[in-house]
Amino acid sequence: MNKLTFHNNKVMQDRRRVCIFLPNDKSVSIIINVKILCHQLLVQVCDLLRLKDSHLFGLSVIQNNEHVYMELSQKLYKYCPKEWKKEASKGIDQFGPPMIIHFRVQYYVENGKLISDRIARYYYYWHLRKQVLHSQCVLREEAYFLLAAFALQADLGNFKRKVHHGDYFEPEAYFPAWVVSKRGKDYILKHIPNMHRDQFALTASEAYLKYIKEAVRLDDVAIHYYRLYKDKREVEGSLTLGLTMRGIQIFQNLEEEKQLLYDFPWTNVGKLVFVGKKFEILPDGLPSARKLVYYTGCPTRSRHLLQLLSNSHRLYMNLQPVLRHLR
């Protein structure tokens, strides 16, 4: 009997390797069929993580420094690099460079109790941990110290004097770089242990809940940013769309910061329209002449943003009765 080489084996030629980056800085590598649906890949990832409730999570690829979330009904190759799709696999250990995919939070919620699955809550917490490291809320500096105390309780458990002293944690793993630079490591390592001690007897799950509740109060943590253009001729987007739990924000891009121009809660958004590259926001109760018109750069980005905004709005409206009950 002749042995088929991997190069000639059609089944193996359709196999590719993907590397899934997780919120907790770990990754998983999966061999998949190049024609797999995004939904099927998400199911495989969740099975590996033993995550039962994935409705707040999605798979994304980075394009032009933005996370593009996959439409789960689409085939994966719609999002993959051309070289990755074309390359024939050369053997079980020779699949070539993997496609990089991110498993991350796609839809934010303000209350961790809405996440009943223990594993899902864990990864939601870790996603926020990473977002906090990039946060720039300079007027809320005390919040970062409280968040670090919750995170240390979640990660290390109860404070133990004989174990938790000196450099028992890395400040850079818990604080934005500007806080570490401003206060210094010695200051943080001196004051945080007492705050860690104050969380005594909190379980990891309870610490996650407290962390989530405090983290989403920071304006730049539970938010997705996407570049927008003022007109068709702009090359560098001078505006940024911020998608939050509660609505849409429009920012002017300055040299080192974003200046908030508009803040539209979902209850004040009358209509969103995407036509080709054009993006229109019609605030509720205002005449059509008062609509805001921006540009996305290409129809594909328009479609992606429309789906993301529509799904976020739908989730927000559906969760309001549940949130009122939790309060």
From Swiss-Prot:
Q: Which biological processes are named by the entry's GO terms?
A: apical constriction; protein localization; regulation of actin filament-based process
| Keyword Cell membrane appears in the UniProt entry | yes
Q: One GO cellular component from the entry?
A: cytoskeleton
What residue stretches are annotated with the FERM domain?
16-320
Q: Which UniProt keywords apply?
A: Cell membrane, Cytoplasm, Membrane
**What PROSITE patterns is this protein classified in?**
FERM_3
- Compartment list: Cytoplasm; Cell membrane
Membrane-topology descriptor: Peripheral membrane protein
Q: Keyword Chloroplast: yes or no? A: no
Q: Which Pfam families match?
A: FERM_C, FERM_M, FERM_N
SUPFAM superfamilies per record = PH domain-like, Second domain of FERM, Ubiquitin-like
- The name on file for this protein is FERM domain-containing protein 6
**Top-down, what is the taxonomic lineage of the species of origin?**
Eukaryota, Metazoa, Chordata, Craniata, Vertebrata
The gene from which this protein is expressed is Frmd6
